[in-house]
């Protein structure tokens, strides 16, 4: 997706909220938008 490794790391190294799909920091424990605690790591590989 990114053109170089630094961009790839910046785009994919996040957590996604399971309720509102917001992007959060990797170290986040709760969602920045809705406060939900169930966060998942962003998928590194696209589903085909």
Curated annotation (Swiss-Prot):
Where would one find the signal peptide in this protein?
Answer: none
Molecular functions (GO terms): structural constituent of ribosome
Gene Ontology CC, one term = ribonucleoprotein complex
- Which biological process terms from the Gene Ontology are attached to this UniProt entry? translation
Write the record's keywords in alphabetical order, separated by commas: Ribonucleoprotein, Ribosomal protein
Q: Entry's Pfam families?
A: Ribosomal_L40e (PF01020)
Q: Which domain of life is it from?
A: Archaea
**Which Gene3D superfamilies does the UniProt entry name for this protein?**
4.10.1060.50
* PANTHER family recorded: 50S RIBOSOMAL PROTEIN L40E, LARGE RIBOSOMAL SUBUNIT PROTEIN EL40
Recorded family membership:
Belongs to the eukaryotic ribosomal protein eL40 family.
Report the protein name in the record. Answer: Large ribosomal subunit protein eL40
